[in-house]
């Protein structure tokens, strides 16, 4: 199969490497300088250093060239640039099947990636979302991982899941597109909180409590938006949440740890050098929670630290001072 992967960040590069084992892959980046580096070094020194890029992967910077022979497209651009990329794509080929592999809410509209597709593409478009616990470096290295591919077209989801699985990558299929995307977006917010907790050395008990109560927030918001409860106990819910809140490769957890050390966001983000979606997702998630009247104390605490300049210690104390209710509320 001819597959185009749009976005040459860490995750896009890892997917391209993984998919190239069974398919003809074209990797697209709009950055001409980055393309030249990829071609010269055959590694993504900016985002996935020391990981060889197979010679079979075709590199392009023209979107028209990336889509020319593609039978399937993986869209792996940051959510901030998703709508613009989709608008360019639909003008070139409005019927090419899409797989969204980006996580977050669109800034300003609070739309999920699948909802942005619905606004840009004809209703007939075949679209799926790919998510789950997966650090890019480990996937690129061929270490075992499991993901979920969800689509309203369940036949399409099963077909693509079978096409992209490898000896080390297990891909399940499903139909809860909203639930999968909410889990993938909000886990980054909870991971910032977990990083703050770890940075302050609150210990394992506190981290476990944060993950568990964070999952409750994800589930409440996800169900309010139309997701299924069962999804949040699966790979794209608790699975992705555990990984992002505990793994040392988690950029969002790292942001939290640096905040706990007294660092300012303005200096943290350039140092990390990658898009850290949780920083932007928390604004939209907090706004959604307010509008839908959903209790989201962990999200609120992260929002207050990042955007209301509330000191970390005060935000934590405010959480601890909350009157506990029934666990299942």
Curated annotation (Swiss-Prot):
Query: Which reaction is the catalytic activity of this chain?
Result: sn-glycerol 3-phosphate + NAD(+) = dihydroxyacetone phosphate + NADH + H(+); sn-glycerol 3-phosphate + NADP(+) = dihydroxyacetone phosphate + NADPH + H(+)
Q: So what EC number does this one have?
A: 1.1.1.94
Q: Which SUPFAM superfamilies match?
A: 6-phosphogluconate dehydrogenase C-terminal domain-like, NAD(P)-binding Rossmann-fold domains
Q: Which PROSITE patterns match?
A: NAD_G3PDH
Q: In what pathway does it function?
A: Membrane lipid metabolism; glycerophospholipid metabolism
What cellular component GO annotations does this protein have?
Answer: cytosol
Question: Pfam families under this entry?
Answer: NAD_Gly3P_dh_C, NAD_Gly3P_dh_N
The UniProt keyword set, sorted, is: Cytoplasm, Lipid biosynthesis, Lipid metabolism, NAD, NADP, Nucleotide-binding, Oxidoreductase, Phospholipid biosynthesis, Phospholipid metabolism
Q: Which domain of life is it from?
A: Bacteria
Q: Name one GO molecular function term.
A: NAD binding
- Active site per database record: 187
**Entry keyword annotation includes Lipid metabolism:** yes
Does the entry annotate any disulfide bonds, and if so which pairs? none
Tell me where in or outside the cell this protein is found. Cytoplasm
Q: Would you identify the family this protein belongs to, as annotated?
A: Belongs to the NAD-dependent glycerol-3-phosphate dehydrogenase family.
What role is this protein assigned?
Catalyzes the reduction of the glycolytic intermediate dihydroxyacetone phosphate (DHAP) to sn-glycerol 3-phosphate (G3P), the key precursor for phospholipid synthesis.
Q: Which HAMAP family match?
A: NAD_Glyc3P_dehydrog
| Protein name according to UniProt | Glycerol-3-phosphate dehydrogenase [NAD(P)+]
Q: Which organism is it from?
A: Nitrosomonas europaea (strain ATCC 19718 / CIP 103999 / KCTC 2705 / NBRC 14298)
């Amino acid at each position: 199969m001819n597959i185009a992967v749009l976005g040459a960040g860490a995750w896009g590069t890892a997917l391209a490497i993984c998919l190239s084992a069974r398919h003809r892959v074209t990797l697209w980046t709009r950055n001409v300088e980055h393309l030249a580096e990829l071609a010269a070094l055959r590694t993504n020194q900016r985002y996935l250093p020391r990981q060889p890029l197979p010679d079979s992967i075709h590199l392009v910077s023209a979107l028209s060239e990336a889509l020319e022979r593609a039978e399937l497209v993986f869209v792996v651009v940051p959510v901030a640039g998703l709508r613009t990329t989709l608008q360019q794509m639909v003008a070139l080929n409005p019927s090419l099947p899409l797989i969204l592999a980006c996580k977050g809410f669109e800034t300003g509209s609070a739309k999920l990636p699948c909802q942005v597709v619905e606004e840009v593409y004809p209703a007939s478009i075949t679209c799926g979302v790919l998510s789950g616990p997966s650090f890019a470096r480990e996937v690129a290295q061929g270490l075992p991982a499991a993901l979920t591919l969800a689509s309203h077209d369940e036949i399409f989801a099963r077909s693509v899941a079978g096409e992209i699985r490898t000896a080390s990558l297990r891909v399940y299929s499903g139909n809860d597109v909203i639930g999968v995307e909410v889990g993938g977006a909000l886990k980054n917010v909870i991971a910032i909180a977990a990083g703050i907790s770890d940075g302050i050395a609150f210990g394992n008990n506190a981290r476990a409590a944060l993950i568990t109560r964070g999952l409750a927030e994800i589930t409440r918001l996800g169900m309010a938006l139309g997701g299924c409860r069962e999804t949040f106990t699966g790979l794209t819910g608790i699975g992705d949440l555990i990984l992002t809140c505990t793994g040392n490769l988690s950029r969002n957890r790292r942001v939290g740890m640096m905040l706990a050390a007294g660092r300012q966001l303005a200096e943290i983000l350039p140092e990390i050098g990658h898009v850290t979606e949780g920083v932007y997702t928390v604004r939209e998630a907090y706004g959604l929670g307010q509008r839908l009247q959903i209790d989201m104390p962990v999200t609120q605490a992260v929002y207050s630290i990042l955007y209301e300049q509330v000191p970390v210690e005060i935000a934590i104390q405010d959480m601890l001072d909350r009157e506990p209710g029934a666990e299942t509320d």
